[in-house]
UniProtKB/Swiss-Prot annotation:
Function: Modulates the synthesis of GlmS, by affecting the processing and stability of the regulatory small RNA GlmZ. When glucosamine-6-phosphate (GlcN6P) concentrations are high in the cell, RapZ binds GlmZ and targets it to cleavage by RNase E. Consequently, GlmZ is inactivated and unable to activate GlmS synthesis. Under low GlcN6P concentrations, RapZ is sequestered and inactivated by an other regulatory small RNA, GlmY, preventing GlmZ degradation and leading to synthesis of GlmS.
The protein, known as: RNase adapter protein RapZ
The species this protein was found in: Proteus mirabilis (strain HI4320)
Keywords annotated in UniProt: ATP-binding, GTP-binding, Nucleotide-binding, RNA-binding
Binding positions (ATP): 8-15
Pfam families: PapZ_C, RapZ-like_N
Record bears the keyword Phosphoprotein: no
RNA-binding keyword on record: yes
Database matches in PANTHER family: RNASE ADAPTER PROTEIN RAPZ
Recorded superkingdom: Bacteria
Amino acids binding GTP: 57-60
Matching HAMAP family: RapZ_like
Length: 284
């Protein structure tokens, strides 16, 4: 099991790194006192956590490096600690603090920002010197840092993107969480068949009705082709979800069928897919 210890100078991106690690499946704890590391690791080992990450900053640094080393030696045998240290040049840190107007953790000790940054560097040097990976974030954006961590730790640039296909009825309103909205009200409507009206797009007779129409096939094919074309770009855009909303008049027949067809297609391509049907969920 991996225990990633994230440290670095304030303003270098520790919070960004911790969020990126959480997206990668790490159990994350922010600002954990060093002497609690063994206890946390033991608890996570009992819960079969595959990977964990903790951040340590200047506020919870031990008084001597020996305390940190002792904490690492006390970790359960199944944990492999790795130390990630984030840094940035002095001018970049000053600019970031100026932009965010936040106080440096050591500014409470009546130090100027410049002196606080320099003092922090000295206090964190024992951690920096034993780091397994040092990343200089001076020229990085938030997204670039997250991307680098995924590349270094997972061997891939994109995070696991979850595609969500949801059906809805326009008469109930457009979902506010949708990234893409497709209108299928022009497709043949099973509602006008008295036998199909009580059914939904999940029922075989409705699916058979829609499957007989060429325009339905063409719409599904062109929609999935559009999504396939841009999916690689979306996967590298630092997002966790892509929500595709399919709407018909009532959200009961056409939109449900089309959403399921698209979900099945991308699921068969190995994508992480969810489907939901807003109108049908309201009826339960």
């Amino acid at each position: 099991m991996v225990l990633m210890i994230v440290s670095g100078r304030s303003g270098s991106g520790k919070s960004v790194a911790l969020r990126a690690l959480e997206d990668m499946g790490f159990y994350c704890v922010d600002n954990l006192p060093v002497d609690l590391l063994p206890e946390l690791a033991k608890t996570l080992a009992e819960r079969d956590a595959a990977a964990a990450a903790v951040s340590i900053d200047v506020r919870n640094m031990p008084e001597s490096p020996e305390i940190f080393e002792k904490a690492l030696e006390s970790l359960p045998a199944e944990y492999s600690p790795q130390l990630l240290f984030l840094d940035a040049d002095r001018n970049t840190l000053i600019r970031r603090y100026s932009d965010t107007r936040r106080l440096h953790p050591l500014s409470t000790k009546n130090l100027s920002l410049e002196m606080a940054i320099d003092t922090e560097s000295d206090l964190l040097e024992p951690l920096r010197s034993r780091a397994d990976l040092i990343i200089d974030t001076s020229e990085m954006s938030v997204h670039e840092l997250a991307e680098m961590l995924r590349t270094r730790l997972l061997g891939k640039r994109e995070r696991e993107l979850t595609m969500v296909f949801e059906s809805f009825g326009f008469k109930h309103g457009i979902p506010i969480d949708a990234d893409y909205v497709f209108d299928v009200r022009f497709l043949p409507n099973p509602h006008w068949d008295p036998k199909l009206r009580p059914m939904t797009g999940l029922d075989r007779p409705v699916a058979a009705f829609l499957d007989r129409h060429t325009e339905v096939h063409n719409f599904i094919y062109q929609t999935r082709s559009y999504l396939e074309l841009w999916l690689p770009m979306l996967e590298t855009n630092n997002r966790s979800y892509l929500t595709v909303a399919i709407g018909c008049t009532g959200g009961k027949h056409r939109s449900v069928y089309v959403a399921e067809q698209l979900a099945d297609y991308f699921r068969s391509r190995g994508k992480n897919v969810q489907s939901r049907h807003r109108t049908l969920e309201k009826r339960k």
